[in-house]
Design a protein with these regions (language model features):
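Flexible, non-catalytic linker and terminal segments flanking ANL/adenylate-forming cores
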Residues: 1-46, 52
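Conserved AMP-binding/adenylate-forming
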Residues: 70-75, 90-133
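AMP-dependent adenylate-forming
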Residues: 48-79
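Solvent-exposed alpha-helix faces
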Residues: 85-89
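Adenylate-forming
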Residues: 49-52, 80, 84, 102, ...
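Aromatic/hydrophobic pocket-lining residues that form the small-molecule binding cavity
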Residues: 84, 112, 138
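Short acidic active-site motifs
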Residues: 18, 136-137
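Conserved phosphate-coordination/catalytic loops
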Residues: 43, 78-82, 129-132, 136
Length: 138
């Protein structure tokens, strides 16, 4: 990893952590977020996925997944927005209400992110479970 940010191909989004920390304010951070359409609040899934899909970045890569064999799967913001909305609709169809907990047992696969953002779109609480912890904790 290069020691100096001027040697990077893509500049870092926070080149001076100490300055960013000293100048941080919640009001400025909130101003960077879109909020839900019609001013209905804030949803992290909308901020992380939907606003990018709706603002001309729909064909940009949102997730790049590399499997154990080295195969690559790119998922665009448009695709991720659609998949996560479908997951949120499935949850609603199952009777999951805002504030309910949704537990997901999955490996580090693209569907884990779909489930996470879909759950957050449904205004439910996402709780990942990982088999690596063994059967006792699960």
């Amino acid at each position: 990893m290069p020691r100096h940010s001027d040697s990077l191909l893509i500049p870092p989004n926070m080149p001076d952590y100490e300055r960013a920390r000293a100048e941080f304010s919640w009001a400025a951070a909130r101003a960077l977020l879109d909020g839900l359409p019609d001013g209905r609040g804030l949803n992290i899934a909308h901020e992380a996925v939907d606003r990018h899909a709706q603002s001309g970045r729909d064909d940009h890569v949102a997730l790049r997944c590399i499997d154990l064999a080295g195969g690559r799967r790119d998922i665009t913001y448009a695709d991720l927005a659609g998949l996560t909305s479908r997951f949120a609709n499935v949850l609603a169809g199952l009777g999951v209400a805002p504030g309910d907990r949704v537990f997901v047992l999955a490996g580090k696969i693209p569907e884990l992110f779909v489930a996470a953002f879909g759950t957050l779109k449904a205004r439910a609480v996402f709780a990942p479970l990982f088999a690596a912890f063994g059967p006792d904790p699960l």
